């Protein structure tokens, strides 16, 4: 049986990337929360 996670940079960026996060209100909230927490990486 194959594993469920098959790594793909393109799919990763398209679903969890910075631009995708900025498109929705909820996504922007995620970015802001990570900024407030002091995360080094905000998105992927």
From Swiss-Prot:
GO biological process: translation
GO molecular-function terms, A-Z: structural constituent of ribosome
Record's keyword terms, sorted: Ribonucleoprotein, Ribosomal protein
Pfam families according to UniProt: Ribosomal_L34 (PF00468)
Domain of life: Bacteria
InterPro entries in the cross-refs: Ribosomal_bL34, Ribosomal_bL34_CS
Single GO cellular component term: ribosome
Keyword Membrane: no
HAMAP family: Ribosomal_bL34
Record-stated family: Belongs to the bacterial ribosomal protein bL34 family.
PANTHER family per record: LARGE RIBOSOMAL SUBUNIT PROTEIN BL34M, MITOCHONDRIAL RIBOSOMAL PROTEIN 34 FAMILY MEMBER
Protein name in the entry: Large ribosomal subunit protein bL34
Natural source organism: Variovorax paradoxus (strain S110)
């Amino acid at each position: 049986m194959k594993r469920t996670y098959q790594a793909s940079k393109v799919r990763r960026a398209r679903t969890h990337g910075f631009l995708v996060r900025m498109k929705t209100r909820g996504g922007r909230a995620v970015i802001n929360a990570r900024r407030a927490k002091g995360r080094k990486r905000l998105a992927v």
